[in-house]
Amino acid sequence: MNSLEMEGLKLELTEKSSKVILMWKGKSRHMNPAMILDPYFSEILDILANKEFTMDFSQLVTMNSSTVPPILSFIKELEEKRINTEIKYDSSLGWQSASFIPISTITRDYKYVKVLPI
């Protein structure tokens, strides 16, 4: 599985035994990121069976509102497939808190997906 780059955004995927980490870096400003992210997320789902997964947004500089729907869809799929997932964000960055507190509210009753400030 490869990392992904698009218009200033880099998603770095690393896999170590039973742990997979997807690190978000840079700026997500694509006008239709779902066109690129949805197929990429589908590929990631294929390798996550019986593994722990972390999506780390702490190094993301900015994210436009168009990026949120594909992330939410992916989170829902992770929960449905029972993939133990941690979503981490930098709570010292106001825009990240503003984006991820609502996501943590949406996922509060999820059993497999947890949103964690760092």
Where are these regions (language model features)?
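STAS-like cytosolic regulatory interaction modules
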Residues: 1-61, 73-118
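Short conserved active-site loop signatures built around small residues
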Residues: 64
